[in-house]
Structure formats: C-alpha cells, structure tokens
C-alpha cells in the first residue's frame, strides 16, 4: 500500500473517467540481467582471436576460409550478380553479334580499357577507409564504461545506512539514464527496446517520479544533461550529510562523471554531424562504375583482326574476379564501419553495454561495498618470488639485457685462447656447445632468478 502522508511519495491523481491503457511495450521484469529475445541479435560477430593464437600457416588458412562475418559473406551477392552480367555479355558477344557489331564492341572495350586508370580506386578507397576507421575508433573509445565512476563512488561515498546506500545507487543509475537516453537517439536496437521514455521507466532504469520530474523540465533541445545534473547534486547532498569527506573526494567523483558525460557528448556529436553524404556516394559510384565497365573491357576478344585480341581464351576472368573481391571487400569494410550503431553483426551492442553498466555499477556500490577480505600475509612473505609454472610448462625466456652478452663474448674469447695456448685449433662447434652448457647449468651472480617482464 502507498502511504500518501509520506512527503517522499509522489502520488499522481488521474480522473476516474479516463481509461488508462498500458503502453505497448515488452516485459522487462528480468532486466537488466536478461535482454528480451526480440532485441537480441540474430547473428553475432565472429571472434577470431583464439584462431590466431599462433601465426602458423594452417591457422591463417583456417581464418581465411571462415564464413560468418567474413569477406566472402560480404561480397558473394555482388560477385554473383557481376559474374552473371559478365557471362550474359560474353554470350551475346560470342553468339549474337554480327561481324561489324563485334568490331564496334571490341573498339568500345579497347577505348574504355585504355582509360580505366582515370578512376583512382586505390587513392579513393584508401583515404575513405582511413577516415572511417579513425572515426570508428573514436566512437568505440567514447561508448562509456561505468567502472571508474562506480569504484570512486564506492570508495568515497561512505556509510552503511540505507540513505548512503541509496545515494550511491542513484548516482550510478542517473549516469546510466543519460547513457540510455543518448543511445536511444542514435542506436537502432536501443530505440526499438526503449521506444518511449515510459519504456525506460517500466524497465526500472528510471523511476516514475523521476520521469515526471524529467518531463517537467522544458527545453527545445535534448535533455541528456538532466540526470547528470541530478548525480552531481547528489554529490553535494552526500557531502552535506557527511557521507563524503571533503571537497577532494567529491571533486574526484565529479571528474569521473564529467569524463563519462564528455564521452557520450562525443558520440552524440558524431551522430549529429556525419561524414558528408557526397563522399560515400563518390566512393560507391567509383567502385561500382569501375566494375560495370569491367564487364565490357575484361571480355576475351576473339576476333582475328581485333587490335586487342586475347592470346588465351579462358572464358572465365579469374584475375578480374580476384580484383573484384579485393576492391569490393575493401568498400564493404568501410561501409560496415561507417555507422557502428546499426544492426549489422559487427556493430556496437549498446543494449548489452547498458545492461552491463547498470548491473556492474549497482553491484560495485551496493553488494560489493565495504566487502574487504581479511588482510593476511601472502605466501611470498619473507622469501624470494620463484617462477610459478613448472619446468615442463615453462615457455618464458629470461631476459638479461643486450649488454649482458659482453660477458659471454669474453668467456668464448678466453676459451679460444686456452685452446690456442694448448696447441689446439679453435673449434667453433665445441665452443658453442660449451657456451650452451654453461648457460643451462651455471647461474651467474649477475643474472636474475626470475624473468623481468
């Protein structure tokens, strides 16, 4: 039951004659620990890092022939269309054209082939990809993790009472609210998950009285800043209530919140001012025009009096197909990274990031607050640290520094002089074997007993 006499309780009275219709949104009762299936990606990106644990040739070959999220998956449709168009033109040229028509076709192909260099694909694609990748990296580093804020709040906002606990939780939640509002406006998946602010409130990330307060603030611009303002005001409240000890602690938390807000501002600004449309249009037109002309210029001309007669009629343009895969794949990489807030498999999963930030942030400032393990002596106390791995599994190479090799050179020189003094001819192989044995079985006082990282 709701206590209407409680001043902290916000009661919204509605007329009895107005039917209240539930919003058409999904059930978020398990949120943030479970994303509804309808918002989960149909296909996830393929993580190939484990496949490249070693640089062996077999591993590289296996990586090249992976399908999911691969170059082949990106270009196979365009390649099939191009091969069909090329084959159709080839059949018409070989069997449907008259002799005079073949001559005109061959001259047209020769004319275009001589001028294919007018389309500087290497320069256009290289410069375009450079801009796109730099933009993508900036967006990636600006997505925002709540970890620093949560750790600073847990460390500096002290108190085990319910009031201090709620202050810590609300600071985290207010930061996540702003992140959710930003992602709602730029990420397709987040927008579908939270189509309205009421959906955000029903999910529990924003409370009903906070939604009312948020809507009461009138502004013609986006109100991403509101919940950050709440979080900073809570810091002042915590300092007034002696939950924060001094200005330094408050300023440290405020600085982390400011960094988080600045990163989200960067993401929002990049969405506001995209790369001019004419540039992606130019690159796409250049690549597709080039390979459209290749349908005619890369035909195998077989007429006896053709100026550019083909020496070997292979029927299938293998080199042009390879060129198509490389250039079209290059273009696909750029277009895949152009808008990382879409629904492609390799785009940013901002739904997961929101869930992760809320779950980890609240756990850090609440469940894990003041949960310090008992301080006991560690197992290395009073002794030197020895290698933790066994001799069988050890693959570390001990680093002694490049100048340490001078001692080894001096040792080899002394051994060589001993052999000469004994009337023996210096044997490089024997000297090398002695050097290896000395390194393996003797420990110099100047050599460390543990590898230096």
Swiss-Prot record:
The chain crosses the membrane at residues 78-98, 113-133, 275-295, 314-334. The keyword Nucleotide-binding does not apply. It comes from the Eukaryota. The keyword Ribosomal protein does not apply. Keywords: Cell membrane, Chloride, Chloride channel, Ion channel, Ion transport, Membrane, Transmembrane, Transmembrane helix, Transport. It is found in: Cell membrane. It is a multi-pass membrane protein. GO terms for cellular component: chloride channel complex; plasma membrane. Its main location: membrane. GO terms for molecular function: chloride channel activity. Forms chloride channels. PANTHER family: BESTROPHIN, BESTROPHIN HOMOLOG 5. Belongs to the anion channel-forming bestrophin (TC 1.A.46) family. Calcium-sensitive chloride channel subfamily. Forms oligomers. This is Bestrophin homolog 5. It comes from Caenorhabditis elegans.
